[in-house]
Amino acid sequence: MIQGVNEQRPTKCDAALARCGLSYPKVSIDRAEPLMTRSHAVALNLFKTKSPDLLMAEAAAPERQLKRTLGALDLTAIGIGAIIGAGIFALTGTAAAGQVFSSRLETPVINFIQAWLSGGSVVFGRAGAGPAIAVSFIVAGIACGFAALCYAELASMIPVSGSAYTYSYATLGEIVAWIIGWDLILEYAVGNMAVAVGWSGYFVQLCDSLFHLRFPLWLVNDHQTATSLLAKGGDALEGYSSTTLPVIAGHSIAINLPALLIVGAVTAILVYGIRESARANTMIVIIKVAVVVFVIAFGAFMVNPTNWHPFAPNGFAGVMSGAAIVFFAFIGFDAVSTTAEETRNPQRDMPIGIIASLIICTLLYVLMSSILTGIKIYTVYTGDAAAVATAFASKPWARALVSAGALAGTTSVILVFQLGQPRIFMAMARDGLLPQYFARIHPRFRTPHITTIWTGVVVGGVAMVTNIGDLADLTNIGTLFAFILVCLGVNVLRRVAPERPRPFRVPFVPVFPILGVILCIALMLSLPVMTWIRFFVWLGIGLTIYFLYSVRHSKLRRGVDAGITEDVPPPFIKT
């Protein structure tokens, strides 16, 4: 049976709750209960939720407060900074011309499902959209829009750093929150490692194109990449000032120094302050949007309308296949929600930043893809990861322009993702799921400096010595999984707390969130088999850490053991 128990000493969190007119209900589990009953209670506690009021009250504690300086324009720039990376230059050609896979592990799961349903053989490829790639971008933007609307509602209701992790804690329970918090490492930290390596490549290209400045092979590549290039020889080694690897203690050495330096520089800015970080991001966003607009405006005069015929050579299947590819050019808008505690008016500005950034990027993508397929017939882009350079091949400045745009694009992605990851770690540490050390706020700068520095060290260090390009798809599947839980969270919170004020409301609930879930699952199935295998391995590692560490240190769980529990039951338990 449940009965009142021990009085607890007041804590700083208790004081913050009292200021908001809230308190922890005092309950405990009778130690004389049968073991099965107590085990059942422990199992239920895995899905125990935190009320939005409690989450906001905990964040309002003076020692935890971040500096609120961001407005709607800053948030929109953060969203654009995260969304538009090198993908706009790399994915457009692939989606228009189609894709061929070399093995079963590289083939999307959906291809195997289609073969099983039709009784035919597995197709090792995806049809291209052709000039209808513009429609593919619209379809992908709409699919992303369902998730964006859900993020906007939850971000305005629960303006707390932590993004999908926090929303899952409020709607689906602690273990689901841990899973999504662990999963988001794939989007932010692992994704940033890959982006930093890509940034290094564009930096080297730009230095060569503009200043004829070349670097030694060993200084701008990790060891695996350097030895691979040496094995290829010939043109693969063109562009380096030296191809000899230094030897220390009998081992050849190669490091990607530019990748480390860009992560280090961004980390320093983020530690110094959110206002300075937002300003730096806005300037970078202006540069990369200007490059995209220039390419669109200049390319419009080179368009040959006959290249747009046939418009959809592979019909509806080609359009949807293209949408599955280009969807991943939209990933990143959710990073806006990690800055909720640093926004002056989060209830109003968070939805504006999330939705406005997605609309602007969709418009730019549609125009860019239309121009590229109008300049050259879409089949030219088969297997081409540099579609813009190919389209402007007759222009000597094309390579430098693409490198400059991609460099600006990846710089802002690194900045925004490095901004987002520490705030998720901070939110998890507040709840006891990570060491409290990670929840510390710098007394002067009011930034989560400990987690920011640690994230920078890990991301920069790994990017310096390893090329994790093969793991880039993990970012995609991790992000889609987060989108699914956020969409589910909207429906859950509408059911368990229908009376709560919602500054922004998703229209047509539960239809829109359900459509978001369905489309995200479909897009997850468009990812390779190997990505799914790696994803489940990653989740397995995360659950192991949860049960070995986080369960024993969870503040919610320790509250139950000490006579303190939450006032919100698991969402599947009717009260």
Where does each model-flagged region fall?
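Extracellular loop-to-transmembrane helix junctions
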Residues: 90-231, 242, 357-360, 535-538, ...
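Membrane-interface loop-to-helix entry segments
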Residues: 198-200, 254-302, 313-316, 354-358, ...
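Hydrophobic, membrane-embedded alpha-helices of multi-pass small-molecule transporters
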Residues: 70-89, 94, 136-139, 251-269, ...
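Hydrophobic alpha-helical segments of multi-pass membrane transport proteins
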Residues: 205, 292-295, 425, 475-502, ...
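Membrane-helix boundary/coupling elements in multi-pass transport proteins
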Residues: 89, 146, 160, 183-201, ...
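TM-loop-TM module centered on a large, flexible mid-protein loop between adjacent transmembrane helices
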Residues: 103-126, 166-167, 173, 205-224, ...
